[in-house]
Regions:
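Active-site catalytic microenvironments in core metabolic enzymes, especially phosphate/sugar-handling
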Residues: 1-263
Length: 263
């Protein structure tokens, strides 16, 4: 029978290195036998309930289990973080359903999340690769057209766009600050793409600082959302796990984009 730890070790064989500091078992026992497992972008209450009601033993989450971000590894976390209602609810639900929780973050980005997002957008092979810094060449087109193409690819009816000028600006080299790489805390990633001649970004999640960083470099940014940019890769990862561990019933739970645009 497959254990939680064996699933984690399998991920390490795919990346060729140990899991990252923010990854690993964060609730339950690593020696636990897994007969059913749910994979989700985040261990939201609905995701935990879905795993529990399916009778699963394990919930694999891509994002931080608790707030503030990665608090379980924080050097000086807020003294009362466990009592925060959002954290207490998640903990109590995991306990109620008897679930183990493992976080698999950057490892799955490496394995398939980034490339699946690029494939969803129809970008083909990158023209520059340095780890997860990748640049894609496209036929020259106006930003407005690229926005419409991203809408069609993602199924999102509306997108936030920081155009950095006119929407008729012609672009030809795409960078992908997927997930949270478009946020202000990750502008260093944007700069690495800029250094390779990117002239447009298709991002997961961004914010005003992140948008402004790109705009002041003359680079328009098209935002999808953190979830939308990573869910397809996590669905693919679920299939990979199913093939690697046929004795375990894996299921993907889709965390929807949390916000709505009200016109």
């Amino acid at each position: 029978m497959t254990t939680v730890q064996e699933i984690i070790e399998y991920v390490e064989t795919l990346t060729g290195h140990g899991i990252n500091r923010d990854e690993g078992l964060q609730h339950g026992e690593g020696s636990r036998t897994v007969r059913g497992a749910t994979v989700a972008w985040m261990a939201s209450p609905d995701a935990i309930r879905a795993a529990g009601e399916a009778g699963h033993d394990l919930l694999i989450g891509h994002e931080s289990l608790y707030f503030p971000y990665d608090v379980v590894n924080a050097v000086e976390p807020p003294a009362d973080w466990r009592a925060w209602p959002v954290n207490r609810q998640r903990y109590e639900l995991l306990e109620r359903y008897g679930l183990a929780f493992a976080r698999l973050h950057g490892s799955v980005d490496e394995i398939c999340i980034f490339d699946t997002f690029a494939g969803l957008l129809g970008l083909g092979d990158p023209v520059y690769v340095d780890g997860l810094v990748k640049v894609y060449a496209i036929a020259p087109r106006p930003v407005r057209q690229l926005v419409d193409e991203v809408k069609a690819s993602t199924g999102m009816p509306h997108l936030r766009v920081a155009p950095a000028g006119a929407l008729d600006q012609i672009v030809r080299r795409v960078g992908l600050p997927w997930g949270g790489l478009g946020l202000f805390v990750n502008v260093g990633y944007q700069q690495r793409l800029i250094a390779q001649g990117c002239d447009v970004f298709i991002a997961g999640e961004s914010d005003s600082y992140g948008f402004r960083f790109a705009a002041e470099c003359g680079i328009p940014m098209i935002e999808t959302s953190h979830e939308v940019s990573e869910n397809p890769g996590l669905r693919h990862f679920t299939t990979m796990l199913s093939q690697a561990f046929p004795d375990v019933a894996f299921r993907f739970y889709e965390n929807p984009c949390i916000f709505e645009i009200v016109l």
